[in-house]
Amino acid sequence: MMTTSDDFNSRRVLFHSSNNSRSSSRNERKSLTLRANAASASKGEVSLLDYGAGNVRSVRNAMQKLGYTVKDIKSPEDILAAKKLVFPGVGAYGSAMDILRERKLIEPLREYVLDGTKPFMGVCLGLQLLFDGSEESGGVEGLGLIPGTVTKFTGDDLIVPHIGWNVNEVKRESYLIDLQKDDPSSASVSERVYFVHSYRALPNENNKDWVLSTCDYGSEPFISAVQKGNVMATQFHPEKSGFTGLKIFDQFLSGGKSEMETSSALPSSASSDAVRKGLAKRVIACLDVRSNDAGDLVVTKGDSYDVREKSEGESGDVRNLGKPVELAKKYFDMGADEVSFLNITGYRDTPLKDAPMIDVLKLSSETVFVPLTVGGGIRDFTDSNGKHYSSLEVASAYFASGADKVSIGSDAVEVAEKFYANNEQGDGTSSIETISNRYGSQAVVISIDPRRKYETDPKNTKNKCIETKRKLGPNGEKYCWFQCTIKGGREGRDIGAYELAIAMEKLGAGEILLNCIDEDGQGNGFDHELVKMVADAVKIPVIASSGAGHPRHFSEVFGAVPACSAALAAGIFHRDEVTVKECKEDMAKSGLPTRL
């Protein structure tokens, strides 16, 4: 028998009191411990090698949250003088090596690691750069400290980038990585941590002494962490791996003496390998942000993109559902796998002068240690003084403020139109191309805002049509395509979501955020037909959005469209109608790989 929304909501209070209290208490204890660390005297100094690419702010915030003083590397001499050195690599391999070479940091970095007497930790690209080289960027030499070449993931059915929460198979004893403690059969399996990368290093006979852990994704396990004495590096991002990641940083910085507790008992429904292991399906909390009529930045939510209150048919104030920074922290504590900020009036604002949005990112990154995405206004623009800014400059400002990914909406539609007009070729100047070339494809999310466009005959449009079984047209039409819109859904264009997604993947985007204007705020579940059509068209991750009204809607879209990597909701979380935990419990009961 199907559970109604009223039945579900009537049981929520009991569910929360019995099932959420322990989780809330654990998170409160962790937060109290972190606040105490940050407030106490410094535990010591750690040097940070920030070469100016991507979001390094979160690494800095994590170490400061743990009670350490962070010193920036400003010269080659600073590397050799460092007591502890953290090297968070972000972006493309070639760009990173070019910057290190220009700043004359390659040789001192090699000397520091080869010496091995002082602690070193590389993160993500900071691990890859330790190898001989990479096939990325047309083939580039690395630091040559670990034997092997970094190569791209392969496999016809593999979704690349590898984005999300996965487990490590730990090969030998180390204080760096915690294991799952609640299942004896998982004695060598770590808690889930956050990965985002398209290239990986493979274990071989020449580097086996370095390999601390591997991760399964694709045709063969790749190296997820290395350690030799005081030298350590991870392919995953500890600073984006919640309390588990903070514990890893604390273990590194304290030499294995961390007292943080991160493991929690998983429910019996999560005991199967299918739930515990493998790349987890992600639950993303989205905050639609805009200024209200008083000029305050608020989180809002609408129906079919209309965010104003209604009173006797008239438009009222912007619907206010809370403060962005507070809600982001709330969702992190609840277990959201990512948090997304969408500035829904960004298409008409001047992004680099949007100080409140920049401040939201900076403040959120101090307390939210999962990936942050920001969207709205990522485009080239000229301000009122005639000064021109590129989309790359806009994205760079967001990355420097704490964002891990940028979401591009209206500009992507116009870029795709030019792409098809130019015989399916990019010109190298678009926002998608310039940002992905600098920061990597994983940093670029394409937000598609389509609505159903019905046709009596699929031949009436150049765009891909489907025969719909979900909802017929107003005159009984059984064919439809999904028309892309710009300007917050106000203007439709003659290009479909299918065509847009294909163009964006070819131009270098790393992820698709697939909204649906027809289902926005309706609570009827995600549009499986739309999600399947786009997920089948590309080999990059697809995020389902718009329509969630019940925890089962998340399980249903993942079951109906196995290629769907994540699902996103906003209003149901803001109004406390559904919690992130409830969605994940339902996913685990359905046997889906879930981070709990």
Predicted segments, located by residue:
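Conserved N-terminal beta1-alpha1 strand-loop-helix module at the mouth
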Residues: 266-367, 423-430, 434, 438-446, ...
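Cysteine-nucleophile active-site neighborhood
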Residues: 84, 90-166
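Catalytic cores of alpha/beta
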Residues: 368-402, 454, 529-566
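Glycine-rich phosphate-binding active-site loops on the catalytic face of alpha/beta enzymes
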Residues: 343-346, 392-424, 516-521, 544-582
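Hydrophobic faces of well-ordered beta-strands that scaffold small-molecule active sites
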Residues: 234, 281-289, 339-341, 372-376, ...
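Amide-donor transfer/coupling interface in amidating biosynthetic enzymes
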Residues: 33, 37-42, 79, 112-115, ...
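N-terminal chloroplast transit peptides
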Residues: 1-22
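Active-site beta->alpha loop and helix N-cap motifs at the rims of alpha/beta catalytic domains
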Residues: 332, 336-338, 342-412
